[in-house]
């Protein structure tokens, strides 16, 4: 068809790249086609063209590719299907419509469109040898994956995630109780009537998926989620010396300064995910502009952009491959952008992520722990909400990068020229409470057993808004929750 010819000519005009491979294949299938099939399936997908020769010495793209055609296209296609359905590859992910014969100036070219394989069936490998027959693709072409890369794909294929594994010989003695109790206080704010508020720490952690009892093997202990979220720093480093967290602020540098603020392993905080998240999140959002906006008689300070930053940070944690060698969860603040980098590649194609595709978290138990205290949107809605929030500004478009060579994902939220603009009203907000927060504090002072529903009715805002305001009061150290859902009470600490 003419449209097919035009499409192929358009592809060739861009030159051979990460999504295109041309092979001569005059009368037989080249052996190298299977390496390309594996690499495309394990990377971004791509197009294989049989019957086209590339002259690498030719710098003019228009002259670089020569259409020579194949002699017996039907035979080659038959051989291709017979081979791909044998034990040459572990999975055939193609359908009939993915293989076509295209006529270009009287010559037959075979076009094979290889989609990116579903993350649940990766890696796609050759010759029944998963560690020697798995390939990926970069700008240089096909390359054999390292054992580390293969193991990462195998880990990613587990639908139930990886943070539920039992960490043998690690128990409640390895939990930083201050971190866990801070979390439980915030949990009470968001779930004041929840029955879990009445149980002991071990039972609470078990209910969250942070502690496991394996009855069949007679073993019990912390799960990866429990240790990484609430563990003592030393215990985490002993078990996961491959993983670290890093926050760097590169704003307003003076002279030879490398950074203006940093949070890394320095012995002054327990190096678990909950403390890292709790300490760094306010640093990332405190100077974002808060335009004056009213809801009824109350001022609204929680902007879509603040929500987007929380979502970006949450995503970086729940999608991080915590078991990867030299894994770094790195959060950066620059004068003109915010950067969130997590170890592990995207499970879905980029275009599906932008459309709101459901990419199951690598760490679903940690995801649930954060969601129970108000962090993380509904499945599939998080990234589109980030995009929508940034469209409301003139700061630039968010950029999501899948860095194959580094085995990491980076999300960049541009800030335009607003990073250094902190209005006077915002400065006042950090020193004193908002009017709504003052109303809530006064309600609690008048009745320390007031319920969330009663606050919602009196303040005349949604339950979600009340819970968000209570979270702010908790984070500022003004409010804590004591006791269970039946006999619990609010305590104003200052």
Annotate each predicted stretch with a short phrase.
Residues 1-48, 52-111, 118-120, 230:
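Polybasic/polar functional segments that serve as interface/processing modules
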Residues 91-172, 324-327, 380-384, 388, ...:
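Intrinsically disordered, low-complexity regulatory tails
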Residues 117, 133-311, 316-325, 333, ...:
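Active-site helix-to-loop segments that bind/position phosphate- or nucleotide-bearing substrates
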Residues 224, 237-238, 348-431, 435:
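Flexible, glycine-/charge-rich segments associated with ATP-binding catalytic modules
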Residues 430-434, 451, 482-494:
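Short, cationic-aromatic polyanion-contact patches
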Residues 434-449:
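Short amphipathic alpha-helical interface segments
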Residues 464:
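Key DNA-contact positions within bacterial/archaeal DNA-binding proteins
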Residues 472-476:
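Alpha-helical DNA-recognition elements
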């Amino acid at each position: 068809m003419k449209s097919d010819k035009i499409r192929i000519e358009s592809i060739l005009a861009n030159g051979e790249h990460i999504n295109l491979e041309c092979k001569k294949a005059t009368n037989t299938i080249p052996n190298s086609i299977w390496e390309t099939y594996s690499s495309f399936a394990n990377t971004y997908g791509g197009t294989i063209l049989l019957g086209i020769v590339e002259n690498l010495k030719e710098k003019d793209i228009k002259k670089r590719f020569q259409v020579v055609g194949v002699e017996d296209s039907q035979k080659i296609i038959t051989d291709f299907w017979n081979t791909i359905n044998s034990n040459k590859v572990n999975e055939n992910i193609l359908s009939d419509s993915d293989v076509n014969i295209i006529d270009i100036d009287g010559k037959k070219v075979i076009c094979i469109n290889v989609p990116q394989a579903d993350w649940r069936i990766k890696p796609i490998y050759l010759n029944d040898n998963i560690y020697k027959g798995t390939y990926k693709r970069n700008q240089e072409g096909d390359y054999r994956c390292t054992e580390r890369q293969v193991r990462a794909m195998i880990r990613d294929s587990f639908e139930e995630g990886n943070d539920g594994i039992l960490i043998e010989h690690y128990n409640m003695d390895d939990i930083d109780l201050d971190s866990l109790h801070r979390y439980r206080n915030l949990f009470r704010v968001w779930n004041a009537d929840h029955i879990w508020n009445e149980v002991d720490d071990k039972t609470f952690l078990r209910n969250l998926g942070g502690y496991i009892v394996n009855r069949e093997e007679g073993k019990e202990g912390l799960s990866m989620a429990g240790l990484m979220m609430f563990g003592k720093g030393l215990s985490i480093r002993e078990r996961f010396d491959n993983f670290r967290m890093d926050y760097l602020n590169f704003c307003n540098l003076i002279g030879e300064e490398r950074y203006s603020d940093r949070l890394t392993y320095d012995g002054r905080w327990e190096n678990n995910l909950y403390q890292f998240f709790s300490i760094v999140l306010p640093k990332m959002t405190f100077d974002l502009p808060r335009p004056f906006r009213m809801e009824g008689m109350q001022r609204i300070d929680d902007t879509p952009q603040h929500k987007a930053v929380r979502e970006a940070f949450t995503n970086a944690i729940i999608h991080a491959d915590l078991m990867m060698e030299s894994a770094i969860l790195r959060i950066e603040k620059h004068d003109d952008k915010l950067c969130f980098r997590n170890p592990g590649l995207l499970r879905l194609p980029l275009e599906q992520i932008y459309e709101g595709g459901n990419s199951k978290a690598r760490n679903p138990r940690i995801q649930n722990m954060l969601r129970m205290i108000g962090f993380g949107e509904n499945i599939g809605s998080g990234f589109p909400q980030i995009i929508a929030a940034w469209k409301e500004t003139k700061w630039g478009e968010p950029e999501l990068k899948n860095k194959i060579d580094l085995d990491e994902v980076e999300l960049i939220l541009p800030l335009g020229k607003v990073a250094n603009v902190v209005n006077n009203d915002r400065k006042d907000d950090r020193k004193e409470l908002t009017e709504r927060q003052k109303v809530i504090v006064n309600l609690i002072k008048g009745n320390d057993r007031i319920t969330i529903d009663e606050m919602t009715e009196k303040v005349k805002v949604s339950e979600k808004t009340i819970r968000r305001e209570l979270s702010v009061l908790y984070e500022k150290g003004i409010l804590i929750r004591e006791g269970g859902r039946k006999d619990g009470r609010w305590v104003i600490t200052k």
